[in-house]
Amino acid sequence: MAHIVKIYDTCIGCTQCVRACPLDVLEMVPWDGCKASQMASAPRTEDCVGCKRCETACPTDFLSVRVYLGSESTRSMGLSY
């Protein structure tokens, strides 16, 4: 079952989530929205196994990276009927 990895604009560009991911699902991309001038991106979500290490590593009060597992993804993204 596919997982959705969502990066929110509260990302501070610290790279903690990228370093925590054992499967290199995440990478940093240029972004002018924070002091670090970069933010996390999830170009390889098909490789995500749902371990949520990226969430655990995120230091922001509102998790900037969220992993929605399987059926949770449609409910969390507001797609359930």
From Swiss-Prot:
Q: Which SUPFAM superfamilies match?
A: 4Fe-4S ferredoxins
Q: Which cofactors are reported in the record for this sequence?
A: [4Fe-4S] cluster
Q: Which UniProt keywords apply?
A: 4Fe-4S, Chloroplast, Electron transport, Iron, Iron-sulfur, Membrane, Metal-binding, Oxidoreductase, Photosynthesis, Photosystem I, Plastid, Repeat, Thylakoid, Transport
Catalytic activity entry = reduced [plastocyanin] + hnu + oxidized [2Fe-2S]-[ferredoxin] = oxidized [plastocyanin] + reduced [2Fe-2S]-[ferredoxin]
Which Pfam families does the record match to this protein? Fer4_7
Where in the chain are disulfide-linked cysteines found?
A: none
Q: What does this protein do?
A: Apoprotein for the two 4Fe-4S centers FA and FB of photosystem I (PSI); essential for photochemical activity. FB is the terminal electron acceptor of PSI, donating electrons to ferredoxin. The C-terminus interacts with PsaA/B/D and helps assemble the protein into the PSI complex. Required for binding of PsaD and PsaE to PSI. PSI is a plastocyanin/cytochrome c6-ferredoxin oxidoreductase, converting photonic excitation into a charge separation, which transfers an electron from the donor P700 chlorophyll pair to the spectroscopically characterized acceptors A0, A1, FX, FA and FB in turn.
Protein name listed in UniProt: Photosystem I iron-sulfur center
Q: Name the gene behind this protein.
A: psaC
